[in-house]
């Protein structure tokens, strides 16, 4: 690879980086409105940066929700979650922001997010955020 080609490659965003930069939560119409059911999504590779040290924080996100009028599209939530990888944000703020954004986009009947962060310095943090009232399924 020539020096010019190498320079161009480092300046041109990769297709995955472009997709993450353009990420937004996309929802589609609930195929079974009026029926109580739950959707469970696990995102095991979440990363963001500690706002105090700048070190990366890693977590498993576990989302359980009961759809309202809309259901979140899976690729969209994957890209949306990946958009946090370079953001400096606390565990508590990122967990609440994700819930706020999901509620704004999909209007679920009930939603719970569990953000299970990898231990660092002998401290293990789990943040749980809920919205709405869970209905029996």
UniProtKB/Swiss-Prot annotation:
Catalytic residues of the enzyme: 50 (thioimide intermediate), 57 (proton donor)
Catalyzed reactions: 7-aminomethyl-7-carbaguanine + 2 NADP(+) = 7-cyano-7-deazaguanine + 2 NADPH + 3 H(+)
Disulfide bridge map: none
EC assignment: 1.7.1.13
Alphabetized GO MF terms: preQ1 synthase activity
Metabolic or biological pathway: tRNA modification; tRNA-queuosine biosynthesis
Annotated InterPro entries: GTP-CH-I_C/QueF, NADPH_dep_7-cyano-7-deazaG_red, QueF, QueF_type1
Residues at which substrate binds: 72-74, 91-92
The protein's name in its UniProt record: NADPH-dependent 7-cyano-7-deazaguanine reductase
Organism: Synechococcus sp. (strain CC9902)
